[in-house]
Amino acid sequence: MTKFETVRGMKDYIGIDAEKIRYLESTFRDLAIKYGYSEIITPVVEEFKLFALKGGEELRETMYVFKDKADRELSLRPEITPSVARAYIQNLQSSPKPIRLFYFGTVYRYDEPQYGRYREFRQAGIEMIGDSSILADLEVLDLLYNFYDKLNLSNDITIKINNIGIFRKIMDKYNIEDNLQEHILHLIDKNKINEALDILEKNLKNKDIIDFFYKILTKKDTKLEDIESLAELEEVSRLDIKSEFLYLFRLSRILSDLNIKFKIDLGFVRGLAYYTGLIFEVLHPSVQFSIAGGGRYDKLIELYGGLPSPAIGFAIGVERTLLVIKDLKVEEPVNVIVIGMSEDTIPSMFMVSRILRKEEYKVVINTKDQPLSKLLPYYASQGFKVAIIIGKQELEKNMITVRNLITRKQISVPLENIEDAIKQTL
């Protein structure tokens, strides 16, 4: 006999585990809407090139890629930002800017499964397209911080930030081609600093610049005053990157004023190849990996064939975020079981259930053919708090019995008083 199980790296979420995911989704959705963002739902399947073009080395190696019956090369989305960029070009390019969009969906990567890493997982994210200002960057970071504040995690998390534009500008100045830039940044992301510096040395042939790269790549915990000092260095002016340091200084100063906990890491880069400026990740002390991340990608829209449009966004790892929440208590409605004692009571069972569901109770109708003495302890063990018992003789008098399955307190009341009776027994 054939036995089917979940595909390796994927998981079923049942009951409370599914409810936790939905709770995070609704919390994020409500917050994003309050910030003025509109929801976007994009297909799970896109053209392979959409992600391969600027996804970065690691992402390309872990994509689920296949050909359809028309011999088109397609992919399950490994992230959602490129899909939003494609949808923007296709549907929203002529709309007033900036465009604010949020999403929640599954993504797929053929990684080696381990703690905090799955082959199917969920991302909640936002994208702001058409605004290059520091206010846009601050809004995105503020939304991200406030999401974790809603989960009572804001005191525990740290947002790690950097400006990848520092590296980009230097490499652009010395005409290092995009593919090589991508590879160098990939090595830095994997903490292979010496390999990255070796490649830079071969291409730049300038020891002063290599020394400067080493200096900033190894400066992990940078203070605000350090950024201001670096901006005044002669080599910074010579490399035309003073504005990139001053931007980081301005952003950091305002984040401090907003009481957002962050740290500057000049050696930090992100693996996705489309980032051009601000980059950031959310860290939590209980895990070794980031639980959210994002950045500015000012050239991606144009690369996809759209008009030049600055953009910034982030993605939250939903499952990873759940791992760091110790006691997430999802508020559940009161569970009510409706038990009819004869066939004559069936219409009343459904009528009572309709009334209670309108009042946000979670109502189940008993389908078991067992005596009441067995049903009551069974449903108590299943988490039901209240039983509505409808007997034939009671019904003739328009009466029902409401029983608290925990305290065993019960009262008989007229049918129209059912809601008050439930509150009275709880």
Curated annotation (Swiss-Prot):
SUPFAM superfamilies: Class II aaRS ABD-related, Class II aaRS and biotin synthetases. InterPro entries: aa-tRNA-synth_II, aa-tRNA-synth_II/BPL/LPL, Anticodon-bd, Anticodon-bd_dom_sf, His-tRNA-ligase, HisRS-like_core, HisRS/HisZ, HisZ. One of its GO terms (biological process) is L-histidine biosynthetic process. The gene is hisS. CDD domains: HisRS-like_core. Belongs to the class-II aminoacyl-tRNA synthetase family. It comes from the Archaea. Keywords: Aminoacyl-tRNA synthetase, ATP-binding, Cytoplasm, Ligase, Nucleotide-binding, Protein biosynthesis. It is an enzyme of class 6 (ligase). GO terms for molecular function: ATP binding; histidine-tRNA ligase activity. This is Histidine--tRNA ligase.
